[in-house]
Amino acid sequence: MAQHTVYFPDAFLTQMREAMPSTLSFDDFLAACQRPLRRSIRVNTLKISVADFLQLTAPYGWTLTPIPWCEEGFWIERDNEDALPLGSTAEHLSGLFYIQEASSMLPVAALFADGNAPQRVMDVAAAPGSKTTQIAARMNNEGAILANEFSASRVKVLHANISRCGISNVALTHFDGRVFGAAVPEMFDAILLDAPCSGEGVVRKDPDALKNWSPESNQEIAATQRELIDSAFHALRPGGTLVYSTCTLNQEENEAVCLWLKETYPDAVEFLPLGDLFPGANKALTEEGFLHVFPQIYDCEGFFVARLRKTQAIPALPAPKYKVGNFPFSPVKDREAGQIRQAAAGVGLNWDENLRLWQRDKELWLFPVDIEALIGKVRFSRLGIKLAETHNKGYRWQHEAVIALATPDNVNAFELTPQEAEEWYRGRDVYPQAAPVADDVLVTFQHQPIGLAKRIGSRLKNSYPRELVRDGKLFTGNA
């Protein structure tokens, strides 16, 4: 694999020499940093099993190497990487996999270790969505996830990835993560804080990642991280699990932050060792039981993961002074909900008791039941999935609902050819050789729902959202 030149400040190298265990080679560290990062993907088990995915992609000649800490994760090598970006494959467009760095699969593995099965989870710094979508898959779309993102520009990307993967149990918020301890005290069974950091571990992906690095900057970042972990710990219920992670390598932003929390709440913080998380985890194990992953250990990004348990309640923070405002939705009455459910089933959309119908004007939404306790405590950017808009003739079903709720065994499902599917993703109407009988058609490709279409004569009218329309070369190889 080709080398690339990474910029290393001298002070950073000095710091790494001091931080690295004697069992590891510093020369190996430098060599690993100069190698480009291996590509990796995670199969979205909400859409397809790992076995079925491997069978589906077998003809492509992809070399898929299992990632030890994630059963559905694989390092991927392809002969035609330049010819077709992974993001333009049919399997990616339909949400069958997520392009995710192998190290970043570790925090969610830690969150669900030892049979942990939380019902209400918070992802404090969620964009672009790799870990939120991984959490949702582990929860099988049950329970609820509060996915927060401080950066307004990244909330849109977060929602797009959640929607593409067919996730229905997520509420999005846009806050500074430091507000949650006061706003929603002790309300979560599990919390992932993948904290903003100095990014020392990402040089294999970005050779210039350390251009603005300084020890002083690390100290400032660590101060913010302490405030974030304190807030997250307050939002965690007694008995709950907190996973703290970063993609950086210095101890000040990693071990020291966790030790600060334990010093602050000595009777309430228990470190849960991660040495048995996967075979070989002991190679990165610290004396506290954390995983400090230098890039040469597993040939991946540098990363840090700690798992903590809150053993008892702690004093509450002062109540927040902001006002959330009136919640603009109201629950749909049972009789009407039954009618809506019946109409939705007619086009192949079904849901279970984990989701409940709410209404705002002419909009119908499905919210995860386990998020309802947070209504009135935080302001949501987006909650659950938009099911439909009502109009005089019935319902206008929404694309995100189709991707999350439809199953391909519906009587009105219509399987497209590869060429027709590509036309669909380009936002064009489709003219199949044999037109379907039904007027409302559940369009599928590779037996995966990819949208709803109206049959108009011999034409299938495209309803693919404009913002998702693709151009350029796609999976059939035609531009």
Curated annotation (Swiss-Prot):
EC number, UniProt record: 2.1.1.178
Keywords tagged on the record: Cytoplasm, Methyltransferase, RNA-binding, rRNA processing, S-adenosyl-L-methionine, Transferase
Top EC class of this enzyme: transferase
Superkingdom per UniProt: Bacteria
Keyword 4Fe-4S: no
Classification via InterPro entries: Methyltr_RsmF_N, MeTrfase_RsmB-F_NOP2_cat, MeTrfase_RsmB-F_NOP2_dom, Nol1_Nop2_Fmu_2, Nop2p, RCMT, rRNA_ssu_MeTfrase_F, RsmB/NOL1/NOP2-like_CS
Binding residue positions for S-adenosyl-L-methionine: A125, A126, A127, P128, G129, S130, K131, E149, D176, D194
Subcellular location, principal: cytoplasm
Protein localization: Cytoplasm
The keyword RNA-binding is assigned to this record: yes
Gene Ontology biological-process entries: rRNA base methylation
GO molecular function: RNA binding; rRNA (cytosine-C5-)-methyltransferase activity
GO cellular component: cytoplasm
Record field: catalytic activity: cytidine(1407) in 16S rRNA + S-adenosyl-L-methionine = 5-methylcytidine(1407) in 16S rRNA + S-adenosyl-L-homocysteine + H(+)
Active site residues per record: C247 (nucleophile)
Function per UniProt: Specifically methylates the cytosine at position 1407 (m5C1407) of 16S rRNA.
NCBIfam families documented for this protein: nop2p (TIGR00446), PRK11933.1 (NF008898)
UniProt record similarity statement: Belongs to the class I-like SAM-binding methyltransferase superfamily. RsmB/NOP family.
PANTHER family according to UniProt: 28S RRNA (CYTOSINE(4447)-C(5))-METHYLTRANSFERASE-RELATED, NOP2 YEAST -RELATED NOL1/NOP2/FMU SUN DOMAIN-CONTAINING
Protein's name according to its UniProt entry: Ribosomal RNA small subunit methyltransferase F
Organism: Shigella boydii serotype 4 (strain Sb227)
